[in-house]
């Protein structure tokens, strides 16, 4: 049996049936990591001994009948901005190079309760600020589909680890597309749930009103299964929702008859690579052939999404990142003659250029004299974007479009031009601003063999509709 080719759900079934064990699966994936990390660099930290010990404990519980769930024994990777008790959590930043949390994020605990084995922490853009996983203090991650290209970001390490078979599934976080865009670039499935569905407790904050944890997986079945596992109401997160409809795997039905799918004309204009456009529209035709009603419509305000997002996200980041000052934990500059100099040097030396850029922008838009002109205006536009989506979902069940305007860029091409990097999020950020769920599903490759993702967007709390549409497409093209 080729263990590594199995999906997470298939692996758990094989373990339950005694065809393999959690220890064998963990050892196989650790061997793959050892062989591939020099090329791909998906991980910041690999907890080899800890993972094998955890796998042994899980295997005993499976054999005793104490763990029977659909993810028991499955090795997972965790993005390095989620706290993991006793394991280095760096946010891919120098400022947290020595930070070992004393608790785990709620989403990670939910996985562990289900019997998942935690392999380690994946590389990311520093503090999740970036779209290429090139702003990491610990080096760039490469795209397993073509190592000369980026894996996307900021959850690039998680997406690349799934694509390279260096884990069976992974957790990422999505503030403006950070799960969906790398999923598209690496040819895996990635989902951002409705805001408040998965607890943010233990997620190191970037933009608190936008951040959401979600799965990166090999297929839609795994995606629904992981989402069902990590979803829970958590009183430790004030934005956590109490949801009744969290049996997401019940939506794994290949049936879109009568489903109304809207295609925004605004998403298919100038700047979209023709190969991406053709692949996404071909995917829409597949759903149409399965009985969905597909039509074009106008979704205005997309042009305002980028300035609105970068105003709000930078403002929240400048506030959230104030806590990293060299006093209680993290990097501390040496030889400072007074407290103020120590703060200044710790932050100057600890943060990378992209993080500094966003802290400066955020501080500017929140400063007196500019607060109304920029920040409050951005909040008003955010409300208008939500209203535009509400109007669209009064008519359509699902909105279908591209995830990114191009396939994965070459390494180094985006860092030279930050604006180009920001524009790469044009199709994903409005979903975060509106708090909606979105999923990226592989829908082909370009002429270079680089993956293309189709994005399906749903109304708040309509993950099941998205899963049904994504599953139908996936089964239709198998």
Predicted feature descriptions by range:
Residues 31, 35, 39, 164-271, ...:
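Structural helix-boundary/capping segments
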Residues 94, 98, 141, 239-244, ...:
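Short, surface-exposed loop/helix-turn segments at secondary-structure junctions
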Residues 29, 51, 79, 111, ...:
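Conserved hydrophobic/aromatic pocket- or pore-lining residues that grip, position, or stack substrates
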Residues 1-53, 289-291, 364:
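An N-terminal boundary/leader segment
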Residues 18, 79, 219:
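Short, conserved phosphate/pyrophosphate- and ester-handling motifs at nucleotide-, phospho-/glycolipid
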């Amino acid at each position: 049996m080729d263990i590594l080719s199995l999906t997470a759900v298939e692996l758990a079934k094989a373990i339950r049936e005694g065809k393999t064990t959690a220890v064998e699966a963990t050892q196989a994936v650790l061997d793959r990591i050892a062989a591939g990390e020099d090329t791909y660099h998906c991980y910041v930290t690999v907890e080899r001994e800890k993972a094998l010990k955890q796998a042994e404990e899980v295997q005993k519980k499976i054999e005793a009948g104490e763990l029977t769930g659909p993810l028991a024994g499955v090795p997972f990777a965790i993005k390095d901005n989620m706290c993991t008790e006793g394991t280095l959590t760096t946010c891919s930043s120098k400022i947290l190079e020595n930070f070992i949390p004393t608790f785990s994020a709620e989403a990670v605990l939910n996985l562990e309760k289900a019997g998942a084995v935690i392999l380690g922490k994946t590389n990311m853009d520093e503090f999740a600020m970036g779209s290429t996983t090139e702003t990491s203090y610990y080096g760039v991650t490469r795209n397993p589909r073509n190592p000369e290209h980026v894996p996307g970001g900021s959850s690039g390490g998680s997406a690349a680890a799934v694509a390279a078979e260096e884990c069976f599934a992974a957790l990422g976080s999505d503030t403006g597309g950070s799960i969906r865009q790398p999923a598209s670039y690496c040819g895996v499935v990635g989902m951002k749930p409705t805001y408040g569905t998965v607890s943010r407790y233990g997620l190191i904050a970037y933009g608190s009103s936008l951040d959401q944890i979600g799965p990166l997986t090999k297929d839609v079945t795994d995606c629904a299964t992981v989402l069902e596992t990590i979803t829970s109401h958590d009183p430790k997160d004030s934005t956590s929702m109490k949801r009744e409809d969290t049996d997401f795997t019940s939506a794994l039905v290949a049936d879109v008859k009568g489903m109304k799918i809207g295609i925004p004309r605004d998403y298919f204009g100038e700047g979209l690579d023709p190969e991406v456009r053709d692949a996404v529209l071909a995917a829409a035709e597949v759903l149409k052939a399965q009985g969905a009603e597909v039509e074009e419509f106008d979704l205005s305000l997309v042009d305002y999404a980028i300035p609105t997002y970068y105003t709000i996200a930078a403002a929240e980041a400048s506030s959230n990142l104030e806590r990293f000052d060299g006093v209680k934990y993290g990097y501390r500059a040496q030889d400072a003659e007074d407290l103020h100099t120590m703060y200044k040097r710790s932050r100057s030396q600890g943060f990378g250029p992209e993080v500094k850029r966003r802290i400066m922008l955020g501080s500017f838009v929140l400063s007196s004299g500019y607060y109304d002109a920029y920040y409050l205006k951005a909040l008003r536009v955010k409300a208008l974007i939500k209203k535009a989506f509400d109007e669209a979902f009064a008519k359509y069940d699902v909105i279908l479009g591209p995830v990114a305007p191009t396939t994965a860029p070459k390494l180094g091409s985006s860092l030279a031009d930050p604006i180009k990097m920001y524009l790469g999020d044009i199709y994903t950020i409005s979903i975060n601003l509106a708090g909606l769920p979105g999923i990226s599903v592989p829908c082909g490759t370009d002429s270079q063999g680089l993956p293309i993702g189709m994005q399906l967007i749903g109304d708040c709390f309509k993950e099941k509709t998205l899963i049904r549409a994504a599953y139908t497409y996936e089964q239709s093209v198998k």
